[in-house]
């Protein structure tokens, strides 16, 4: 029997509540599909600041080092905003984890589920077609990290500058990640760039074309970022995998998230070259609803499914979770964020419904 060690970092706000439901669902699939998950919980974020005085204690990092994957909840809240920025939960925990594990690839699925069309802000005829896409975003290069970066001059001559830099090897590895994702899906990649203006995008487009030759089954399309943001609104059903640089992926993934209608539905994964990953909901810690039992656990549950698929290659078990989520939603069960006129189910009830549907 295959055994995997999972570092569980529930974090702050609704993190512990939704994490409990993800573990409940994982317990069900490991029993059904015959593999073993060993869960070890660690403090992170504000919870770690309160208990240990720092957002990412040494024992948490050590535990993550010893694990095969990290299942992450959410961090942050108004309680810790008075701290210096680099000591706050988000910057003091997530960014160091990404750096330590060299997590260069961010996967953000965006799916409009049947029965949830009314929550989609797009026109009804567009929403009726549904959509199921994943944004593959490069996380460690580009304008956020490129040098030189800074300010000089004074008065009206004050100047600020950032540099968009990409090495070919950075583009090669993120392109392969996107094509690998496409092979597990509908075999379409849309590479997003600005190759009519930017040198970095010209290299991006050239490199993606080279990598595409390794994946003859995958259909590739190049699209300028400005057009991509429009097509995402006009015809979201036409996208499968969107391959983006850091800044373009930052923008596109949030746009894709918004048109699903609920942040409580959106998982994400950040991976390194070895397939080690950190899996977390795309939404925040929502301290305003923490402890009330009304948070939507689906994003955390789907993040767990992504862990099974991308770090452990347990595709059948991952699909079973995703199908269970679809079935529960199709049966009309909703947490408060999605309840229309129906009586909403609690966080724990939603987790139990999904576990029972596997």
Curated annotation (Swiss-Prot):
Its EC number is 1.1.1.85. Its cofactor is Mg(2+); Mn(2+). GO terms for molecular function: 3-isopropylmalate dehydrogenase activity; magnesium ion binding; NAD binding. NAD(+) binds at residues 77-90, 284-296. Pathway: Amino-acid biosynthesis; L-leucine biosynthesis; L-leucine from 3-methyl-2-oxobutanoate: step 3/4. One of its GO terms (biological process) is L-leucine biosynthetic process. It comes from the Bacteria. It catalyses: (2R,3S)-3-isopropylmalate + NAD(+) = 4-methyl-2-oxopentanoate + CO2 + NADH. Catalyzes the oxidation of 3-carboxy-2-hydroxy-4-methylpentanoate (3-isopropylmalate) to 3-carboxy-4-methyl-2-oxopentanoate. The product decarboxylates to 4-methyl-2 oxopentanoate. Belongs to the isocitrate and isopropylmalate dehydrogenases family. LeuB type 1 subfamily. This is 3-isopropylmalate dehydrogenase. It comes from Mannheimia succiniciproducens (strain KCTC 0769BP / MBEL55E). The gene is leuB.
């Amino acid at each position: 029997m295959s055994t995997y060690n999972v570092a569980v970092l529930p974090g702050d706000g609704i993190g512990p509540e939704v994490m409990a439901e993800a573990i409940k669902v994982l317990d069900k699939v490991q029993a059904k599909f015959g593999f073993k998950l060993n869960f070890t919980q660690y403090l992170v974020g504000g919870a770690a600041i309160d208990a240990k005085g720092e957002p990412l204690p040494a024992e948490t990092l050590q535990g993550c080092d010893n694990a095969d994957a990290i299942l992450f909840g959410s961090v942050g809240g108004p309680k810790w905003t008075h701290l210096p920025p680099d000591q706050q939960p988000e910057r003091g925990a997530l960014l160091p984890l990404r750096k330590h594990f060299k997590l260069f690839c961010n996967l953000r699925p965006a799916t409009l589920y049947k029965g949830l069309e009314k929550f989609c802000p797009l026109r009804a005829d567009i929403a009726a077609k549904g959509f199921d896409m994943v944004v593959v975003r490069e996380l460690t290069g580009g304008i956020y990290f490129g040098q030189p970066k800074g300010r000089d001059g004074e008065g009206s001559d004050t100047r600020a500058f950032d540099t968009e830099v990409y090495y070919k090897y950075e583009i090669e590895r993120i392109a392969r990640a996107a094509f690998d994702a496409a092979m597990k899906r509908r075999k379409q990649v849309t590479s997003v760039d600005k190759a009519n203006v930017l040198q970095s995008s010209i290299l991006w487009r050239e490199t993606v074309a080279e990598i595409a030759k390794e994946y003859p089954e995958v259909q590739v399309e190049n699209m300028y970022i400005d057009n991509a943001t429009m097509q995402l609104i006009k015809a979201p059903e036409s996208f499968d995998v969107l391959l983006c640089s850091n800044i373009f992926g930052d923008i596109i993934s949030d746009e894709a998230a918004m048109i699903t209608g609920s942040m409580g539905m959106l998982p994400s994964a950040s991976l390194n070259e070895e397939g080690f990953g950190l899996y977390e909901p795309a939404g925040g810690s929502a301290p305003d609803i923490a402890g009330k039992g009304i948070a939507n656990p689906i994003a955390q549950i789907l993040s767990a499914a992504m862990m099974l698929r991308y770090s452990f290659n347990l595709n059948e078990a991952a699909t079973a979770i995703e199908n269970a989520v679809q079935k529960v939603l199709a049966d009309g069960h909703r947490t408060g964020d999605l309840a229309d006129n129906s009586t909403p189910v609690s966080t724990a009830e939603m987790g139990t419904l999904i576990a029972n549907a596997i």
